[in-house]
């Protein structure tokens, strides 16, 4: 067995000299110290060897394994340096060449959509507000009619930083903060009309239409005499401005813990004029957002009297709107920093 070990080491040294790239290095590593290698088999069989030779063979086998690992690491470093030099040589720039025209940047496609939506609502009196992405459980859940251990929380897989702090799962956390601020004014003639946007986080598996991080817009209005009719008008106004067509909207009953009644908002398909296509899945309608009247329990939890105040709220995913407006099929395109993809939208940002 000692001869076999020495033969393994000699064979390794010969083959190591022939290694020219990292792929063949990986194969050599697997051959000599992988789980199915001859050396590993010998190490596993040492316990079956007679005691008088066990120590000698075990010591030699481990010494050879350490030597092989050290030489592999040294060879790997050499190969990496070699590949780096080749790469640097290929990317070498002749600084004496005449400079080409400068390329100017442009707005990110998501910022284009955000600014378009913001302009629509600031024109009709909404105020922009912003908040923190790390939020307390109180404002992210409890003040939005999602008490501790309530099953409705399962609708949003959440990243917890500790028992009290989370990465916000929606921009609706600003709804509870602004309602609480309105209640603190303690006057009946105050009203609220705000819009907020930003990153939110959920434990979704990333794929073509889902991401663990995405952007949303949230709107909230709250004053003495506001009704579902006002909500419907605002929704239709926004959709017609956003998609630049005289489209129709459809409201379907739904459920959200912080609104009652709640609706899903569909728009008539602006890609096929409601005739049926792959975008609208042959239905003629595209779902774009959720909305509703603020639940009276939410008003109470934030210190407002539901007999004096009513409110409306709705939210929309920025990436979803961008995907619909610009025919983008994969949400990951927004975050890969691919200049060739992003510069397509330069025209829209000018």
Swiss-Prot record:
Pfam families on file: Phe_tRNA-synt_N (PF02912), tRNA-synt_2d (PF01409)
Cofactor: how and how many bound: Binds 2 magnesium ions per tetramer.
Protein name per UniProt: Phenylalanine--tRNA ligase alpha subunit
Assigned keywords, A-Z: Aminoacyl-tRNA synthetase, ATP-binding, Cytoplasm, Ligase, Magnesium, Metal-binding, Nucleotide-binding, Protein biosynthesis
Record organism: Mycoplasma mycoides subsp. mycoides SC (strain CCUG 32753 / NCTC 10114 / PG1)
CDD domains: PheRS_alpha_core
Claim: Secreted is one of the keywords in the record: no
EC number: 6.1.1.20
Gene Ontology molecular function terms on file: ATP binding; magnesium ion binding; phenylalanine-tRNA ligase activity; tRNA binding
Subunit structure: Tetramer of two alpha and two beta subunits.
Subcellular localization, as worded in the UniProt entry: Cytoplasm
Family: Belongs to the class-II aminoacyl-tRNA synthetase family. Phe-tRNA synthetase alpha subunit type 1 subfamily.
GO biological processes: phenylalanyl-tRNA aminoacylation
Primary location group: cytoplasm
Binding annotation for Mg(2+): 260
Protein's gene: pheS
Superkingdom of source: Bacteria
């Amino acid at each position: 067995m000692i001869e076999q070990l020495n033969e393994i080491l000699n064979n390794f040294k010969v083959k190591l000299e022939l290694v020219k790239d990292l792929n063949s290095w990986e194969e050599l590593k697997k051959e000599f110290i992988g789980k199915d290698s001859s050396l590993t088999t010998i190490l596993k069989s040492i316990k079956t060897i007679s005691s008088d030779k066990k120590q000698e063979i075990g010591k030699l086998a481990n010494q050879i394994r350490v030597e092989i690992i050290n030489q592999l690491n040294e060879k790997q470093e050499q190969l990496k340096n070699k590949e780096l030099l080749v790469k640097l040589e290929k990317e070498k720039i002749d600084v004496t060449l005449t400079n080409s025209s400068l390329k100017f940047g442009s707005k990110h496609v998501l910022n284009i959509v955000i600014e378009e939506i913001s302009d629509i609502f600031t024109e009709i009196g909404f105020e922009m507000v912003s908040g923190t992405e790390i939020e307390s459980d109180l404002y992210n859940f409890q003040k939005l009619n999602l008490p501790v251990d309530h099953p409705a929380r399962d609708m949003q897989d959440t990243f917890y930083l500790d028992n009290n702090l989370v990465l916000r799962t929606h921009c609706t956390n600003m709804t509870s903060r602004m309602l609480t601020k309105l209640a603190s004014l303690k006057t009946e003639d105050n009203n609220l009309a705000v819009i907020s946007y930003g990153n939110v986080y959920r434990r979704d598996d990333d794929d073509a239409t889902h991401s663990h991080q995405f952007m949303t817009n949230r709107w909230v209005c709250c004053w003495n005499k506001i009704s579902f009719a006002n909500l419907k008008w605002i929704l239709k106004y926004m959709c017609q401005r956003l998609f630049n067509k005289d489209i129709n909207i459809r409201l379907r009953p739904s459920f959200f813990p912080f609104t009652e009644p709640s609706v899903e908002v569909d728009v008539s398909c602006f890609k096929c004029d409601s005739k049926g296509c792959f975008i609208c899945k042959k239905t003629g309608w595209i779902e774009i957002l959720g909305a509703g009247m603020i639940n009276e329990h939410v008003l109470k939890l934030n210190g407002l009297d539901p007999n004096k105040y009513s409110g409306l709220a709705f939210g929309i995913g920025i990436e979803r709107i961008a995907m619909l407006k610009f025919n983008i099929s994969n949400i990951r395109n927004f975050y890969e920093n691919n200049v060739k993809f992003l510069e397509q939208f330069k025209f829209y940002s000018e």
